[in-house]
Amino acid sequence: MLKNNIKLIGYLIRQKNHAILQTKMITVANGHRIIPLTVHVADTPKKRDKGLMFVENLPENEGMLFVFSAKTYGGFWMKNTLIPLSIAFLDSNGKILKILDMVPCKGNFCPTYDPELYYHYAIEVNLGWYKRNQIKEGDFVMFV
């Protein structure tokens, strides 16, 4: 059992204070190499609203994939999020349009991290993961 009570059961995951979420393996290509990333899929309004709230630890090559049925506009906030994150906003082809760093918010008034563009997907990972892997705007995510 992992420290943060994450138990892998096939392609499903149960986290403390979270419902069962489907996981998916994706890859991120930076022009020099392909980096695998396991993501927890948030594809309903309820799952997207919960996001990574109350998660105390996120393994290094894991994240959360937010899937929207159509292009969307607007930002993310970090209310009740305990760990700092980086987020990439993608178009419908998987092209990374914008990457932002986000810090936890302990108060009631939390800033919104807004890419100020339309996007189809968003991927949250540990703070600095994109930078450590030399992933930048214009790179692509492949949904395997």
Language model regions located:
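Compact, glycine-rich, soluble single-domain proteins
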Residues: 8-144
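Helix-rich terminal scaffold detector
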Residues: 2-5
